[in-house]
Amino acid sequence: MPVQGSQRRLLGSLNSTPTATPHLGLAANQTGARCLEVSIPDGLFLSLGLVSLVENVLVVTAIAKNRNLHSPMYCFICCLALSDLLVSGSNMLETAVILLLEAGALAARAAVVQQLDNVIDVITCSSMLSSLCFLGAIAVDRYISIFYALRYHSIVTLPRARRAVAAIWVASVLFSMLFIAYYDHAAVLLCLVVFFLAMLVLMAVLYVHMLARACQHAQGIARLHKRQCPAHQGFGLKGAATLTILLGIFFLCWGPFFLHLTLIVLCPQHPTCSCIFKNFNLFLALIICNAIIDPLIYAFRSQELRRTLKEVLLCSW
């Protein structure tokens, strides 16, 4: 994805030197300020991408195989896995191509590399946007299932879910193409940051409201069975811990990347900001880590999906 100082990374690899920074790193700070730069080895970067790729392929395969999982909720989970798969796959492809170019093992004209870079950028950006959208869609789906339980199947139908999925993919591709074309405009970067904050607020509000309803429900059950208050408090603490982990992982994995975009707009030449820019590889690795964690949170907790996944793995042997 084009960002200040790292755009056209594949083209830069055609004339690379042994000190060139691979995939998505920014130029070294020229101000002389001491910076903390976390180096992400190419092997680690590719390994994270491979783990994410395998995990999300398994999720998509299991949902596609089991007709019992062809519901709106699993439709969103499947699309989230597909988005995460594309995030990991596109970055693995870019890293591999850059390494091959730098090693001289791949010969390509600049025009071909330019087109490949553009395609990878669009895939990466659109899959990131769609991943955020599907995280929000899953939160909305769960909210409706709790607060409108009796009407859920009439509100969230499979045709509506499919239309929502199609709209998300189309919008993600279109906006990613706009971003790639106008990445040097501050308004475009700020729109991406606002979009991330909107998704964060949406998820926080919905999940906090769901936690409050669950605590009220648990309290009602405790009163019905004349239980003591500590049982309800324990449920509330467990729910709060789960919510903190869910939102915390989302913020920690995605936040640094969007902080990077914000600082490009606010202080592109400031020494401190330049130090942060040098850790862009780390920020991207965190997003790939989120792609690894998403299946654990949203998919593998389903007993039906785990059973189907076991069948898929046994059949593959």
UniProtKB/Swiss-Prot annotation:
Xref: SMART domains: 7TM_GPCR_Srsx (SM01381)
Keywords tagged on the record: Cell membrane, G-protein coupled receptor, Glycoprotein, Lipoprotein, Membrane, Palmitate, Receptor, Transducer, Transmembrane, Transmembrane helix
Gene Ontology, cellular component aspect: plasma membrane
Keyword Methyltransferase: no
Regions crossing the membrane: 38-63, 73-93, 119-140, 164-183, 192-211, 241-266, 280-300
Bilayer topology annotation: Multi-pass membrane protein
Pfam family for this entry, one: 7tm_1
Family from the record: Belongs to the G-protein coupled receptor 1 family.
Descriptive protein name: Melanocyte-stimulating hormone receptor
Native source organism of the sequence: Chlorocebus aethiops (Green monkey)
